[in-house]
Structures are given as structure tokens and as C-alpha cells.
Design a protein with these regions (language model features):
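S-adenosyl-L-methionine-dependent nucleic acid methyltransferase catalytic domains
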Residues: 1-497
Length: 497
């Protein structure tokens, strides 16, 4: 082949509009998509990467008919290519079409190998390992979309990236599923059938991760479950058991005793001292207090300023219409300015930032607790003033954090948050200068407890995966990596931001 005769399909034509349409549809897919594994800010659509890899490895002449008028061959070739690529680039993908695409790539690769080596190379030679597969290198792999699609199309893929987050994502997306994804009767595990020695074998990566994930949940529940107690149902009329202090897992709702609610969210607001020196009240920095906006059910928190006091109360107000609430739940802090509910003084954004820089923006006020009622749909909203005894004790929790850090060596994250204009999240303007500042004491204790449990799970797995044939620390490391990614996702959702 001459250089001109080996022009690739991507150099001549790809149905960009059709690929873009499918990529847009793929973007809305959440369940089972690799983008849900871990946040990466430069995710590439899988279908677009599939088209790019296929187009880069298949010759431009692949779909050009051999017979017919020369002036029509090019247009016919483009039409044929468009039809096939539109079938190929569907998410998640048709296995039959993908297999056909693999054949196209291997046929082209076999032809190139034949010319390069001077020996006849067939597709069967490549499939059976007598000749190498086409190699695809992505030097800036990021979320791993291009290497993943290269693997899907039967290539040998290599992924590089200097960013450690990208490296973790690539391990979980590309490496570990290939090495440990399938059940292995020759390796120790916790979820597979027992071998002749009576040892439990490796049941597959997904099952092992689920097993150890449940192990971590049980351990964390035993350590900090008392901080998330069940709450007595104010509408329950029957006899209820003694007050429960243990947190029931949401997957085990049948075990929740009658007369209790399961807390699923605690709603907080940051506060600042009133700008008026003669007032000095605590001003909530909350923009809106909507809890529910559904047909025939409108629920919001009403801010009440009791005379003679310095802290507001939040009352749960419910109505069948928005007007029936009697107040505007969205009429609070606006544009970074907060109005004192006691004296009406406006705390502008500059004042709020100055208070934060002085370290006086680290106090919170619990507004409400959101619960579920076992066996029933919908949420139950309870005012914090009606459930004050169930609010966490920050002083006691801080002591538990110190004890946990001393026992495990896991400190509260003190790394500074980047402050340059390009990458900053601007929290430093409010005095939140380290990652540890972004969490309440209970959130921090929860995250540290999970981190410690994941570390212990890896140690336990390394011991249990040990066999007479040798230790398998990499399998335990793979499981722990997925669990660590889940803790990271938890940190994204459970912060004060």
C-alpha cells in the first residue's frame, strides 16, 4: 500500500451529525455508564470515541463499491459508511454490529501486517495470538473512554495520564475488570463456590466489591450508628418500643420498629452574626426554604423570630397550594446578601466574607430533619425545634474524631484549597481555606470512619485471599480501590457546600 492508498476512514468521512445526536442521548444515561464511577471534568462520549477509533483503523476504501461509475463511488462509499457507523455508534452498543466492526479492523490490520512483514497474515492469526492485535495509545486518557472503546473493538489499548485521579479511574475502568472481572475457581475469594480444599473462591469482581461494601457498611453502622437515631413518629397512635439509638439500614426497612421514622437528611444553614452591633442576632444564610413542591403538596420552612431571643426558629408549613403557605419560601438571602429577621439590617456579601475570613462562619443551625415512614411513600418533614434531642453534639463528635485519628492515623484533611483564578472553587473567600473546613463535625467523622473501614477491609481481604498457592494482594487492592472511589463520591455529596 502507498501512503495515499492507506488513508483512513476518519480522514475522509464520518457522519458527525448522527454521532453527535447519539452522544447527546448517551449523556443523559446514568445507570451503568462509566461516567458515574467517578467525576472527571473532561468526559468524552463513548459513542464518539468508538467512531473515532473505528475510523482511525479502517481504510477509507472500506465502504467504496468496487463496481460502478467512478463519479458515484465516493458518494456511495460515504452513504454505506454512514449507515454502518450509525448502527455501530449506539449506546451501549449492539454486540453483533460491534463484532462486525472488530472484523473490519482486524482485516485491515492483517493486510497491513502482511505488507510490513512480507508474510501472509490472516484475521485468524491475530485472533489466535500468532500475530499482534492493533495497538491504540491514548497519552492523555483522562476518564478512559478512548482506551475502553479500543478494547471493545478488539484492540490492544494503552492509557496514560499524569493526573492521579485519572489513573485511578483508568484502573477501575480498564485494568481491574479485565484482570479480575470473571469468577476464578483457582483464586481465593468470598463469593464464589468452594474449591476441593473447602476454600471459598473468587466470585467475580462485582460480587467481591459488593461483599466488602456491605462489610464496610456494617462496620461503620456499628461505630457511628448512634449518631443517626430513629426518630419517634409524631403521628403514631399506638404503643412503640423503647427509644432506639441504632441506625437501621435503609435496605432493611422491615426491621424498623413501629412508631419510628428513618432520618434520611438533616438540613442545615450557615449563620453569621448580625451586622448591627445593637442587635447581635444570629442570621441564617439561607436563600430559600422549600422542602416539597408537588401537586396538592407544598411544604416549606417558615423562619420565625421570637421576641427577646437572638436565634430564629424554623416551622414546617404545609398546604395544598403555594399561596396557602402564607409566605414566600424563596424570599430570603439574595445576591449574597442576608437580612436579619430580628432588626432588618442587611448583611451584604462583603460583610459575610469578612466574617468568614475572621473564622466566624463555621457555625451551623439545624433547620429540619427529613424522614421516611417505613412501608409508605413520600417524605416526612420535622422541624429542628421539635427534634432538638436528636441533633448531633459537635463537642462530643469532635472528641470522637480525635480518638479515631489517634487510633487509625487518619487526620482531618488539612490540605489547602487551590486559590488561583482558574481552578479555585472560591470557598477561601469565606474563610474555608482547607478541605476539612467543608464538612460539619459529624460529616467528617462519618467520612473518616468510612476511610478507616475501607483500609481495614483491604487488610482483612488480603489475609482471607491468601492461599497455599500464594497471596493475592492485588485483588484486595482492586476491591479497596472501588470502595475508596465510593467514599470519594460520598464526600462530594456530604459536605456543607
Amino acid at each position: 500500500m502507498s501512503d495515499n492508498s492507506d488513508r483512513r476512514l476518519i480522514e475522509e468521512y464520518l457522519p458527525i451529525k448522527a454521532i453527535s445526536t447519539e452522544a447527546l442521548r448517551e449523556k443523559s444515561v446514568r445507570k451503568g455508564h462509566i461516567s458515574t464511577l467517578h467525576l472527571w471534568w473532561a468526559r468524552r462520549p463513548l459513542v464518539a470515541c468508538r467512531a473515532a477509533v473505528y475510523g482511525a483503523l479502517v481504510p477509507a476504501s472500506r465502504f467504496v463499491p468496487e463496481n460502478g461509475p467512478d463519479n458515484k463511488k465516493q458518494s456511495l462509499g460515504r452513504a454505506n459508511a454512514a449507515k454502518f457507523i450509525e448502527r455501530l455508534c449506539k449506546y451501549p452498543g449492539n454486540p453483533t454490529v460491534i463484532k462486525e466492526a472488530q472484523r473490519h479492523i482486524l482485516e485491515a490490520h492483517a493486510e497491513r501486517l502482511t505488507e510490513e512483514t512480507g508474510k501472509k497474515v490472516s484475521v485468524e492469526d491475530i485472533e489466535e495470538g500468532r500475530a499482534p492485535r492493533p495497538k491504540v495509545l491514548d497519552m492523555f486518557a483522562g476518564g478512559g473512554a478512548i482506551p475502553l472503546e479500543a478494547l471493545r473493538l478488539g484492540c490492544e489499548a494503552y492509557a496514560l495520564d499524569l493526573n492521579p485521579v485519572a489513573h485511578i479511574i483508568e484502573l477501575c475502568t480498564l485494568v481491574y475488570p479485565q484482570k479480575y472481572g470473571k469468577p476464578d475457581p483457582n483464586a481465593r475469594g468470598m463469593t464464589g463456590p468452594k474449591n476441593p480444599k473447602g476454600e471459598t473462591t473468587w466470585g467475580g469482581l462485582a460480587k467481591e466489591v459488593r461483599f466488602w461494601g456491605e462489610w464496610v457498611l456494617k462496620k461503620v453502622n456499628a461505630e457511628i450508628g448512634d449518631l443517626y437515631p430513629l426518630i419517634p413518629d409524631p403521628d403514631y397512635k399506638g404503643n412503640r418500643p423503647a427509644v432506639q439509638t441504632e441506625m437501621w439500614q435503609s435496605s432493611d426497612k422491615e426491621s424498623i420498629p413501629p412508631g419510628y421514622l428513618m432520618p434520611v437528611a438533616y438540613l442545615w444553614t450557615r449563620t453569621v452574626r448580625c451586622k448591627n452591633p445593637s442587635c447581635g442576632a444570629t442570621v441564617p444564610l439561607v436563600r430559600q426554604t422549600w422542602l416539597c413542591k408537588k401537586k396538592d403538596r407544598y411544604v416549606a420552612l417558615k423562619m420565625v423570630a421570637p421576641p427577646g431571643e437572638k436565634q430564629v426558629r424554623f416551622e414546617v408549613v404545609e398546604s395544598k397550594t403555594e399561596q396557602g403557605l402564607g409566605f414566600d419560601p424563596a424570599g430570603f438571602s439574595k445576591g449574597g446578601n442576608a437580612t436579619c429577621p430580628f432588626c432588618g439590617t442587611v448583611a451584604d456579601s462583603g460583610y459575610v466574607k469578612a466574617e468568614g475570613q475572621a473564622g466566624r462562619l463555621s457555625s451551623y443551625q439545624l433547620m429540619a430533619i427529613v424522614c421516611t415512614r417505613p412501608g409508605k411513600q413520600g417524605k416526612v418533614y420535622l422541624s429542628a425545634d421539635d427534634t432538638a434531642e436528636f441533633a448531633p453534639d459537635d463537642v462530643a463528635i469532635s472528641g470522637r474524631i480525635e480518638a479515631l485519628s489517634a487510633r487509625t492515623g487518619l487526620p482531618v484533611p488539612g490540605e489547602p484549597i487551590v486559590t488561583d483564578a482558574k481552578n479555585s472553587c472560591w470557598t477561601h473567600l469565606y474563610g474555608l481555606a482547607t478541605f476539612g473546613h467543608l464538612f460539619t463535625p459529624r460529616q467528617m467523622l462519618c467520612l473518616l470512619t468510612f476511610a478507616a473501614a475501607v483500609r481495614e477491609a483491604q487488610e482483612q481481604a488480603s489475609r482471607l485471599y491468601h492461599s497455599r498457592d500464594g497471596c493475592h494482594p492485588e485483588r484486595a487492592k482492586a476491591v479497596a480501590t472501588y470502595l475508596a472511589v465510593l467514599v470519594n463520591r460520598q464526600a462530594d455529596k456530604e459536605s456543607t457546600l
